[in-house]
Regions:
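ASCE RecA-like P-loop NTPase motor cores
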Residues: 1-239
Length: 239
């Protein structure tokens, strides 16, 4: 989880470690066969007024085809509440929303109900372990960059500038990479798990820094076709 782009340089820098032996151990999971990563084509523009509804319209058929069993991890409370409201108005699936009950109870209900959707934000991106058929689809609304006006980050950005560094590449990208890895990591928790991750952010494939994110994620099979996601989730062989 701590490596970014194949190295621990960011982690070592945060701890003030100048020299250290680095070793990355291979995962026991067979990601190419166990998981599919999709960055969909034709994503709604983030500056459109109807972005939330357009995103809901795009995602709901995939969620329903999978009969729930889905985490929707959001980067803002506004998106979290908006998507949950859209799903509740347009689907018969059980839609669970972070904040409506304690975290442990939410997870218990999600696992018990089987065909449910959990819409959540920050606290569910890490430290959550759902194994087996209860969870086979993780959707992430966009890359988890921390707002640059967040006080601690703002101070670190200023310190980086004073030292002649590049705050975006030295701080903001590595931290967003680590957070994204944590979110994606909710899916495959066991060697028998199988499922798909959908990341609704074209910057992964349209911006130069997207490669840093992709290189840091598990080596899942990749697609931009949401139909391929449905096929994969329904255990059909992909072309």
């Amino acid at each position: 989880t701590l490596e970014v782009g194949g190295t621990f340089n960011h982690f070592c820098q945060r701890l003030g470690i100048e020299q250290a032996e680095q070793k990355i151990l291979h995962s026991p999971f067979d990601y190419p066969n166990q998981s599919l990563l999709c960055v969909p084509r034709y994503l709604p523009a983030t500056n459109q007024n109807n972005t939330l509804q357009s995103l809901g319209e795009m995602l709901l058929p995939i969620i329903e085809a999978n009969k729930g069993r889905c985490f929707v991890l959001c980067t803002s409370y506004l998106m979290m509440r908006g998507l949950a409201e859209y799903f509740r108005e347009n689907s018969e699936l059980s839609i669970l929303l972070q904040g409506e009950m304690p975290k442990a109870k939410l997870l218990e209900q999600f696992i018990h109900e089987t065909h449910s959707v959990l819409v959540a934000t920050s606290s569910f991106w890490e430290g959550v372990d759902v194994r087996g058929d209860a969870l086979s689809l993780v959707i992430i609304d966009k890359l988890p960059f921390t707002a640059p006006d967040e006080p601690l980050l703002k101070a670190r950005i200023e310190d980086c500038r004073l030292q002649g560094g590049d705050p975006f590449n030295d701080i903001q990208i590595p931290e967003a990479v680590i957070t994204l890895k944590q979110g994606v990591g909710r899916l495959i928790r066991d060697v028998t798990d199988r499922g798909a991750v959908i990341i609704c952010d074209n910057r992964l494939v349209m911006r130069n820094y997207g490669e840093t994110f992709l290189k840091s994620l598990p080596n899942s099979t990749r697609t931009r076709d949401l139909n391929k996601v449905v096929q994969f989730l329904q255990n059909e062989k992909m072309d």
